[in-house]
Amino acid sequence: MPSLLLSLLLLQVPIICAWLLVRFIIDLTGKNGTIPTIRRWPALFPEFLDRLSYNDNAAQLVEEGYRKYKDRPFRLLKMDMDLVVIPLKYATELRAITSDKLDPLTASFDDNAGELTGILLGSELHSDAIHRRLTPGLRIPSTKYCRILTVCAFPERVGYLTDVIGNWTPVIPYELVLRLSTRAAARVFVGETICRDEVFLETCSSFSRNTFDTIATFRNLGKTIGFMLGILTPSVRKAREQGAYVQKLLGSEVERRRACPDEKHDDFLQWCIDLARTEQEAKPEALATRTIGILSMAVVHTTAMATTHMLFDLLADSKLRETLKKEQEDVLPSGWDGIDQNSMLKMRLLDSLMRESQRINPVGEFTFRRVVRKPITLSDGYQLRRGQQIAISARRINMDGATLEDAQTFCPSRWAQETQGASFSHSSSSNLHFGLGRYACPGRFFASYMIKAITSRILLEYDFKLESGREGYRPPNSIQGDKILPNRDAVVLFRRREVSI
């Protein structure tokens, strides 16, 4: 097997060298004179060197571009594409442009290493299912989803936390929350039977990790090289094996449900079955792939990152931790037996912390990723050309003192006294990380419920502290190109308290 892999690698070398030469020539002959380019290397060097070094310097390049060209577009040279960063002043008119002109699906496909992962391509079926079935259900005054999120996430007690009151257990928070998120979301996405399948649950958690590692590799290598060498990468091979397992499992479930039309199911998989409009969308394997892709990456992975960031924020501030615990006790005086939608809405300080934590620690530098499908002339005459990839530098905008007072300061209660429009899940030009317009993240309301459910229950039932015992210390983030991750190595000690649930 190793010799076969080596042979395949050697066969790829001439192709890669030829591609690098072509890319070098394109850089020399295809200069874009209308958009300033932010470079790490001096102008006399080829742009290809900037592409190679982008991931090591992304944060500094974005900061420099925003500082110099805050009110005009600038260009970044990524390994797999040119990215045109659009200023905030265009946000209002861009959000109204339809997907036939500004394509969010292809941009998401490219950003998620679609050639290697095979997720999120082809249609907006998943968005339709969330908009038309999931989100309306969250708005109904009911305990249904609140109970699902907490009971399924914490089955009888969390097996990877000690069940013995008073004992400290070492835990890696990201892994803990990844498992909790998977359990909570699986019930809503695949139904009651499959959500209890431990192999499926572990596969979903592992698929999230492997897919993210695949995406990181893809961004380092670029689209062409990544596609050619991807099959040699362990995370790619493992993710594909897991994808095949899920295709078989969920594909069989789709066929079984179609054979038993009298059965009633209320989950994401069934919503996609019901709402599929084309033959391709309705294929069992396509439904399975879409379900695992959305569940693992759009729901579980992003929820796990946001919740882990918040836990680290709480670790660094014992006063905040106690204040939030008091809020949960006031909102839920009888414990989780009394949870409902109204209780979730009363968690104003927790919601404020969620938004502020995401402002400081978003998933990445950019939002509103789009591919320009048709030429667009904006109100001031600026033209977007067909084929360009564009994005808005959400992180820099939200950290700009001209946009937000005292923007460099982390203030957990910043949004607690504001109106509902300032909530974590509200999408606007002042809360950009969920995107803008009709294509803003459709699952942000469900994500808000998940994060609140998991964090609130941890606050009510557990004490936690850093294994190192360092007070006031927050484990540093991990930066991968223009993506921002919580520390996935920090060890935290958890101890269950005596509570009445």
Curated annotation (Swiss-Prot):
Its EC number is 1.-.-.-. Its main location: membrane. Coiled coil: none annotated. The chain crosses the membrane at residues 2-22. One of its GO terms (molecular function) is iron ion binding. InterPro entries: Cyt_P450, Cyt_P450_E_grp-IV, Cyt_P450_sf. GO terms for cellular component: membrane. It is an enzyme of class 1 (oxidoreductase). It is a single-pass membrane protein. Keywords: Heme, Iron, Membrane, Metal-binding, Monooxygenase, Oxidoreductase, Transmembrane, Transmembrane helix. GO terms for biological process: secondary metabolic process. This is Cytochrome P450 monooxygeanse terP. It comes from Tolypocladium album (Soil fungus). The gene is terP.
